[in-house]
Amino acid sequence: MAEIKKTWHWSIFSFVLFVAGIFLGLANRNVLQIATMESLATTSNKWFLYQKLWFILPITLVLFSVYFGFVGFPRIQRQGFRYPITIIASILFLFSIVILYTDLWGYQKFFSDFWARSLIVWGIGWLCVWALHFYNMKQNVFHIAVYVFIAFGILFLIVGQIPRISNSPFTLAWSEGSFIYMASAIFDKRIYGVDLPLPYIMSTRHLLESIPFLFNDIPIWFHRLWLVILSLGSAGLLGIIITKKIPDLSRINRISLCLWVVLFVYQGAVYYNILLSVVLLIWGYEKNNFRKSFVFMILASIFGGMNRINWAFTPPILFFIVWIIDHPEVVVGVKAQGLYLFKLALWGLLGAIMGIGALFLYYIGLGGYTFATFIERMSATSVWYRLLPSSTFSLGVLAATIVTVIFCWIILFTKYSRFIQLPGFQKFLLLSMNLLLFLGSIMVSVKIGGGADLHNMDAFLISTLFTFLFSLDWDKVQNLSFKSSSILILPMFILMLVPVGWRIYAIGPVHIRTVARDQNELDILKSTIKKITDECSSPPLFIWQRQLITFGHIDNVEVIGDYELVDLIEMAMAENRPYLRQFANDIENLKFSLVVLDPVPENFGRGKSFSEENSLWYNDVVSVVAENYLEKIVLPQTGTTIFFNYCP
C-alpha cells in the first residue's frame, strides 16, 4: 500500500473541492427555486432522478480527485487507470455538451444558471487535466489546467457562434438585419436601383460586411458566416500578432496565450472593426523602429476614427503604453519631464487629428450628413445608474469591468511584472493613460443605448491587456507551477479562468432558425403587403426587416432610404426633433401604404431592461404609427408587426 502523503497534489485537490462545494451550493439553490416555480412533485420519477444525479455527479468527481491525491499518480498509472479515466472524462464531456446546449431530456432549464454550468465545467475540466497528466507525468499540472480550461472556453465560444449561421430570412437579433441592409446600401444602385444614404454608424464595419455583396446571389447564411469569420478572425489575428511580439514563449504557451487573448477581448464583446484598428497598430509596431511604428499608429487612428470618435484618440495612447514599457528611460527634472510629455502629446494629437479628419471626411464629405447632426448624436442622454447592477445589465458596468481586469492589475504590482521596475515618472504615465481610457470608456458606456455589456469599455480593456502582456516577465511566468510556494499562483490561475467564466455565462441552447421554420410568417407578410399595396398607391415602409428586400424574399417593393430602424432609434435617443417631426408628418399624411415594425415594447417602465430606450421608441415611433395606421398584424414567432389601413 502506497504511503499517504499530503503533497502539493493534495493542495490542488483541496482547492478543487472547495470551489466545487461553492458551485454546488449556489447551483443547488437555483435548482430548488426552479423546481418550486415549476411546481415539480418531489415524488415524480424525473425529479427524483434529477436530484440523485445532481448530488451524485459532482460528489463523485470530487471523490475521484481526492482519491487520486491520496493514492499517487505513479501507482494509478501502473494500475492502468489512465485509460478508464480518459474514457470517463470523454463520456462526461459529451454528456455536458448535450446538457448545456440542447433540451434533449428536458433538463436544460436546470442548467441555465451560471453556477450549475460552472460546476459541470469545473468537474469535467479537472478530470481532463488528470487524464492528460497521466499520459505525461513530467508535464506541469498548472500548465495542463490552463490549457484545458482555455480549450473549454474556445469550444464554448465557437459553439455559441453556430446559431448565427442561419438561412432564416428574418433578422436573428434586433439590429442584425439592419446592419446587413446597411452593408448592402454601399451597392445601392446594383441591388435596389436607387440612391441610398451611406451608412454612418461604423463605416469600416459596413465596408467590411459589404464584401460578400461584391458577388451576386450570395445567400444570407453566407453573409452571416462572413460576420462570424470577421469576429473570430479579428480576435484570432490580434492574438497571433501580440504573441509574436512576446519573445521566448514556448510553442504550446504561445498558442495558449493567443487563444486566451481571443477569450479576453470577447469578454467585452469588442467589435471586430475596433479590433482591426488594434491589429493594425500592433502589427506595425517595432521596438527599435519608431518611424514605422508611428506610421502604423496614424493608420490605426484613421481606421479607428472612422468607427467611433474616441477611437481616433485611443491608438496613440495604446502605442505610448507599449513604447514606454519597451523604453524605460529615466527622465529626471521638471523640464525634461515636460519635454517628454510635450512630445507624447504632439505625436498623439497628430494621430487623433488624422482619425477625426477621416471620420468627418466620410461622415460629412461622402455621407452628406451635417456637423449639427453629428453633435446631436454626441449629445444623447446619459444613464448613470447602469454603472451599477440593473435590469439592463445584471452585473453593472463597473462590477463587470472590475471582475474582468482586477487580476491583471494585481499581478502587475508583483515580481512577475516589469511594471514595478519602471521609473516612477513612467509608471505614473502608464497609470494615467489607463485611467484616462477608463474614464472615457465609462462616459461612452453610460450614454443611452449602451450599458448592457462591456463593449463600450473596449478602449480600457485593450489598454489593460497591452499593459499586462507587455509588462510581464515571461521567463518567470512560464515557470509557474502548483509545486511552487508562490501565493501568486492563485490570482494567475483565476486570471486565466475569468474569460472562460464569461463564455460559461453566455452558454445557451443552440436553436438554428431555418427558412422552413419561418416560411409561414414570410407567406403572411408577403400576402399582406401584396394585398395592401395593390389597394393603395403608396409604397410600404420597412423600418424593420429590410434584409427581406435585400435578398429578394419581398419583391416588387421600393426601398425607402429614410427611417431605417437603427437610424430612427439613434435620432430618438438624440431627441432630434426636426427629424422626428418629419417622420411624424409623413406618417400622419399616410405617405406609406403600411409600416413594418419590430415587436411593440410593453411594460418598459423603470426597472425594465432598456427602459429609457424603449420609452423613447414607443413615444416617438410606435405610438405615432399606431395612431395613424389602425389595423395591425403581429407575426408571433418573429414579433414582426405590420401596421396598415384598408384603402377605399
What label would you give each PLM region?
Residues Q267, S471, S484-D518:
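Transmembrane alpha-helical segments
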Residues F114-V121, G449-L488:
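Hydrophobic/aromatic-rich transmembrane helices and adjacent perimembrane loops
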Residues L597-P648:
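Aromatic/acidic, Gly/Pro-rich catalytic loop(s) in extracytoplasmic/lumenal soluble domains
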Residues F13-V62, V98, T102-Y107, F156-S210, ...:
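Transmembrane catalytic cores of multi-pass membrane glycosyltransferases
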Residues M1-K6, V66-Q79, A131-K138, T243-L249, ...:
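Membrane-interface junctions at the ends of membrane-embedded or membrane-associated helices
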Residues L225-C258:
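Transmembrane-helix motifs of polytopic, lipid-linked glycan transferases
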Residues Y200, S527-M573, A584-F604, L635-I642:
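Short periplasmic/luminal acceptor-recognition loop of GT-C membrane glycosyltransferases, typified by
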